[in-house]
């Protein structure tokens, strides 16, 4: 159990000591991890912090507008890098290579922004499960195992690296962050790219973005899952009228968890599953089938890639 006040005081000191007089860039995604990092760093170094939101083109529906609004007073730099990420992911089908390509692109963008702002340090919202999965070979996280070795920063500051997700939420409460941030559902750093099996294209991302929005609309308020989402897992055969067609298969996943290290599928009512399937196939052209994933973690991970 983390002593919240003690942790906040210690993290503020560590950030201040690590940064010294240097400017620090950080990735602010709007999730609880990066938001807590931003709040701690603001206390520690004030205007030395340069928060950056990277629009990768792999974000949830309406995410960039939400971030602009939520952090309107934070002197946030917004970088439109969608074309860069799709170019970096072209032709890649292996999940591990995807994560590494995304991690490398993030670092190159932060290095570029650091040069523009005079920053020499990088602050990240890495948490303990990220380290466990990367170091254990389960999957590389874009901010740990997916990072390139040849970074140009003097150092990387990771004040949350020993905390689990539920502990980060407690720290968010201790910092007085809004409930919207404190209890926000986890979203992977690589974005929707890890919810597309196979090569990532703009067409596939557009489909999975709409499917994710429908899943969240159907489940978040009523069932309060730890995480829920849709993934594009392949092509299958369907029928429209009397005509056979090949369309996309969308898998829906909704789990309960405490810290993300283990998770159990939510046993959703059939009516809810049917409503989601009907909406996804009716509202998104090209989707022929919807399935619901009931695999716990372990043996599966929560995300598909």
From Swiss-Prot:
Q: Among the entry's GO cellular component annotations, what is one?
A: cytosol
Q: Which reaction does it catalyse?
A: XMP + L-glutamine + ATP + H2O = GMP + L-glutamate + AMP + diphosphate + 2 H(+)
A Pfam family: NAD_synthase
Query: Signal sequence: where?
Result: none
Q: Does the keyword Nucleotide-binding apply?
A: yes
Could you tell me the superkingdom of the organism this chain comes from? Answer: Archaea
> Which of the seven top EC classes does this enzyme belong to?
ligase
* Protein EC: 6.3.5.2
Residues that coordinate or bind ATP: 29-35
Can you give the residue ranges of the GMPS ATP-PPase domain?
A: 2-184
What GO annotations for molecular function exist for this entry? ATP binding; GMP synthase activity
- Pathway in which this enzyme or protein is active: Purine metabolism; GMP biosynthesis; GMP from XMP (L-Gln route): step 1/1
Keyword annotations of the record? ATP-binding, GMP biosynthesis, Ligase, Nucleotide-binding, Purine biosynthesis
Q: Is Disulfide bond one of the keywords?
A: no
Query: Which SUPFAM superfamilies does the entry mention?
Result: Adenine nucleotide alpha hydrolases-like, GMP synthetase C-terminal dimerisation domain
What HAMAP family does the record tag this protein with? GMP_synthase_B
Q: What does the annotation say about its assembly with partners?
A: Heterodimer composed of a glutamine amidotransferase subunit (A) and a GMP-binding subunit (B).
Q: What does this protein do?
A: Catalyzes the synthesis of GMP from XMP.
**What is the name attached to this protein's record?**
GMP synthase [glutamine-hydrolyzing] subunit B
Q: Which organism is it from?
A: Methanoculleus marisnigri (strain ATCC 35101 / DSM 1498 / JR1)
